[in-house]
Amino acid sequence: MSDASLTKINWQPTASIQTLLKRSKIMAEIRQFFTDRGVLEVETPALSEYSVTDVHLSTFSTEFLSPFAKQAKTLHLITSPEYHMKRLLAAGSSSIFQLCRVFRNEESGKRHNPEFTMLEWYRPHFDMYRLINEVDDLLQQILDCEPIESYSYQFVFQTYVGLDPLSASRAQLVEKARKHGFACEEDENRDTLLQFLFSEIVEANIGQERPTTVYHFPSSQAALAQISSEDHRVAERFEIYYKGLELANGFHELNDAKEQIRRFERDNQLREQMNLPPQPLDMRFLAALKAGIPNCSGVALGVDRLIMLALNANHIQEVMAFGVERA
């Protein structure tokens, strides 16, 4: 390779050094926020024996071959530290947080990079609303923004889509989705329709002036959240949006191992229907649930998007040392 060819290679970072200095200060401020509240910082593996069953997540995988092993072992880069952190909760860690790199084999663009930084924390004895208040405190401190406003999923869906997401027929959802450009079939999965309408219509109308929490997602979208004891049609799950970005996703955490197994198995059934490979269940995580995790709430927050908002950046790679195109 000649020296001339090297001069044509763009080796420079995607973020300016000035931006990286500001990023470092924000990361330190986040850590201080939790230190002041007595929350323990933890580190958990980036590689896991298990993938995830969620049909909306795709992992990066690699093969680990020990010098003494007869065959390679498949390992997956984590999409979230959730399962490992809940194992720490089961072991008695009390309140914990983590700043770590996570990996999703998906799109890359203005708001997405396949490798990004996640802030995740868990608060024993917090209900969903108390945790939302703590997220609000963090956002006001980092972004100097107005306090969060909160609405139920049902309310914002009815307001902007014009249908009740908890009672609308599949035919009504299909008709509305088609009007907004979704080429769906009559038997399209109900949650796929809800998620399309929410992302296409609702998200564009919320969180523009101040951070907005949407809570009580349909129970079919509970993921790892508990079902509401007051209304079994909805889950104790929330998401936070601000200025066109989904910032955080939180749960009043499910702590019933049998119910979690049922949900994982339903995920795998859906994966088969979508011609996706089913995934083995994370037995270590399920064993920890059976051993018992405390009643708690937890949330995952996209740090790069938070920094985008803090620094008025237009592209996620502007706040990363090296985006995927220059990794």
Curated annotation (Swiss-Prot):
GO terms for molecular function: acid-ammonia (or amide) ligase activity; ATP binding; lysine-tRNA ligase activity; tRNA binding. It is an enzyme of class 6 (ligase). It comes from the Bacteria. Keywords: ATP-binding, Ligase, Nucleotide-binding. ATP binds at residues 104-106, 113, 246-247, 302. GO terms for biological process: lysyl-tRNA aminoacylation. InterPro entries: Aa-tRNA-synt_II (IPR004364), aa-tRNA-synth_II (IPR006195), aa-tRNA-synth_II/BPL/LPL (IPR045864), EpmA (IPR004525), Lys-tRNA-synth_II_C (IPR018149). Its EC number is 6.3.2.-. GO terms for cellular component: cytosol. Belongs to the class-II aminoacyl-tRNA synthetase family. EpmA subfamily. Homodimer. With EpmB is involved in the beta-lysylation step of the post-translational modification of translation elongation factor P (EF-P). Catalyzes the ATP-dependent activation of (R)-beta-lysine produced by EpmB, forming a lysyl-adenylate, from which the beta-lysyl moiety is then transferred to the epsilon-amino group of a conserved specific lysine residue in EF-P. This is Elongation factor P--(R)-beta-lysine ligase. It comes from Haemophilus ducreyi (strain 35000HP / ATCC 700724). The lineage of its organism: Bacteria, Pseudomonadati, Pseudomonadota, Gammaproteobacteria, Pasteurellales.
